[in-house]
Amino acid sequence: MGTVLIHVCCAPDLLTTIFHVRDAEFFFYNPNIQPLSEYEKRREAVDKVANHFSLNVRYGEYSTEEIRKWYTAVKDYKDLGEGSKRCERCISFLLERTAQEARKRGHESFSTTLLASPRKNLPMIENIGKTIEEKYGVKFFFKNFRKGGAYQEGVRLSKELGIYRQNYCGCVFSLLERREKHAEISRKRGHM
């Protein structure tokens, strides 16, 4: 595997990932996470995990310009739901930036903690990673980080350590979808 730079989406998935790969440099880059208060909660949770396990975490830029670049990448697909082309474009955006950082810092490969999430499509992520690998000449390290009980152990540890566990993917579109879903459930309960 050599040296690897692993994109970090959130602390719960980081906890799951480190059961498989701990000797790595981690990269928290997420201009997709909104609002700012949510980004700050997630960054603080990653800090807590990094400090607890002595992990090497770098932080990518979170600015209006980076958010604008991310929005440009996904805006044509904003009305599509979770797991759609919108997510594919978002993941591609995040992994491309990770590959650029990996190449700049001399890493042999790059990966993502998204591979730990039970809500993500692993073949889609692998395809995106391989495409970016060809573009930047940095290998994409693919591994199902959920395996071997790691996901369940990550959940247990996050509760034990008091790590923030988010309830939506991160982007404003997934937040709105979640709110709409909960409003619909509430309406149905109100009519029973």
UniProtKB/Swiss-Prot annotation:
Positions that bind [4Fe-4S] cluster: C9, C10, C87, C90
Q: Is Ribosomal protein among the key words of this record?
A: no
Q: Which cysteines are joined by disulfide bonds?
A: C169-C171
Q: Which InterPro entries match?
A: QueH
Q: Which UniProt keywords apply?
A: 4Fe-4S, Disulfide bond, Iron, Iron-sulfur, Metal-binding, Oxidoreductase, Queuosine biosynthesis, Redox-active center, tRNA processing
Q: Does the keyword Cell cycle apply?
A: no
What the entry lists under Pfam families is as follows:
QueH
**What's a BP term from Gene Ontology annotated to this protein?**
tRNA modification
What EC number is given for this enzyme?
Answer: 1.17.99.6
Q: Name one GO molecular function term.
A: metal ion binding
The metabolic or biological pathway listed in the UniProt record of this protein is: tRNA modification; tRNA-queuosine biosynthesis
Q: Which chemical reaction does it catalyze?
A: epoxyqueuosine(34) in tRNA + AH2 = queuosine(34) in tRNA + A + H2O
Q: What does this protein do?
A: Catalyzes the conversion of epoxyqueuosine (oQ) to queuosine (Q), which is a hypermodified base found in the wobble positions of tRNA(Asp), tRNA(Asn), tRNA(His) and tRNA(Tyr).
- Family recorded in the similarity comment: Belongs to the QueH family.
Q: HAMAP family this protein is in?
A: QueH
Identification of the protein by name: Epoxyqueuosine reductase QueH
Query: Which species expresses this protein natively?
Result: Thermotoga maritima (strain ATCC 43589 / DSM 3109 / JCM 10099 / NBRC 100826 / MSB8)
